[in-house]
């Protein structure tokens, strides 16, 4: 790309390097504006003779075209692309959803120097109309060879961002304590409703029971018949892992235990399992507080019907210190 001052009459089709103002201070054209014949008449009428312009060389792509190309390739799901002036494309959620980010691929793309991409946080919950990512290029033009590096990465690895919709999730809740579950319900019910409302969900099916392996297993099996999006187990006893009453009950109900312990504070004593495609969570004791904890990090992808793995739980440690 070449940048130089030229006579006004020689600027047709070239790109303004700087904004142009009237003597009164009012802007006539913005930086990045492509000059036309009508524009020349306007500037001549303002008494201007020369302006600084850029001209693309062979093998370069205009900035807006470049960011549109990258924005189209980096994402999938419930999104739309909105191109703004100055070589920027924003990705906007078209419905409530959960973001899934390939962090390694994002880093590779941001090392190409052709464009940069900024995204929301992996597993974050986003609302309709919220910006979830932005793509920005260097001013005016991008090298086609650098852009090809980016598109090649995307062809090989797939999109780096998914916006998985969260559509009418249903939740099953088990309240368990040493007696009949009433005390557990009293401690957890209000905050559970409050927490789920943040994600457009509610405890649709609830069961009270004693905290024994058999009683909790029966409660899980009962809730599974309703085919909820997820099941939360709230107990007055601090979780102790797969060998405690809740963990044994999950196994008895046919669950595969995916992960015990999360590198998140508060909420490290967290147990996740699956019965077929239904996630079942033994909530940590901090769940009774409305303050952010591990459940807030895990719920969005589960409500979007994404199967969170033990490895992905382990990766929550970076940024997992919530309080």
Map each language-model feature to its residues.
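Structural motif
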Residues: 14, 18, 27, 49-52, ...
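Phosphate-binding glycine-rich loops and their immediate beta-loop-alpha structural context
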Residues: 128, 139-230
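Residue-level "contact hotspot" at macromolecular interaction interfaces
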Residues: 28, 34, 122-125, 263
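Flexible, glycine/charged-enriched surface loops at secondary-structure junctions
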Residues: 53, 79-84, 142-144, 202-206, ...
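Short, low-complexity N-terminal leaders and the immediately following helix N-cap/first helix
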Residues: 1-86
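Generic secondary-structure signature for well-ordered alpha-helical cores
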Residues: 45-49, 72-79, 128-137, 197, ...
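Extended, charged alpha/beta regions that create polyanion-binding interfaces
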Residues: 57-166
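Short glycine/threonine-rich loop/turn motifs
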Residues: 204-323
